[in-house]
Amino acid sequence: MRLSVCLLMVSLALCCYQAHALVCPAVASEITVFLFLSDAAVNLQVAKLNPPPEALAAKLEVKHCTDQISFKKRLSLKKSWWK
C-alpha cells in the first residue's frame, strides 16, 4: 500500500503541475481535508468519486496513520506546498 500512495502522489504532482509551480486548488483541498479533518469529512469527499469499498478502506487506513503525525508537523507539511 505504501507504494500505491507514493505512486498516487507522483501522479498528482505530474498531472497538476503548472508552470508557476502552484499546487492545483483541487489537490490542495483534497490534501487539506485528508490531513486536518475527520473521517466523516474524508468519506464525504471520497463519496463524490464513488470508489470501491476497498479503496475507501485503504484511504481511511492511511488517514489513521497520518493522524498520528503531530498537528504542528502536519501544518508545516501544508505550508510547504500551499504558498
Swiss-Prot record:
This is Secretoglobin family 1D member 4. Belongs to the secretoglobin family. Lipophilin subfamily. Keywords: Secreted, Signal. The keyword Kinase does not apply. It comes from the Eukaryota. Induction: By IFNG/IFN-gamma. InterPro entries: Secretoglobin, Secretoglobin_sf. Expressed in all tissues; the highest level of expression is detectable in lymph nodes, tonsil, cultured lymphoblasts and ovary. Seems to be involved in the regulation of chemotactic cell migration and invasion. Residues 1-21 form the signal peptide. Pfam families: Uteroglobin (PF01099). It is found in: Secreted. GO terms for cellular component: extracellular space. It comes from Homo sapiens (Human).
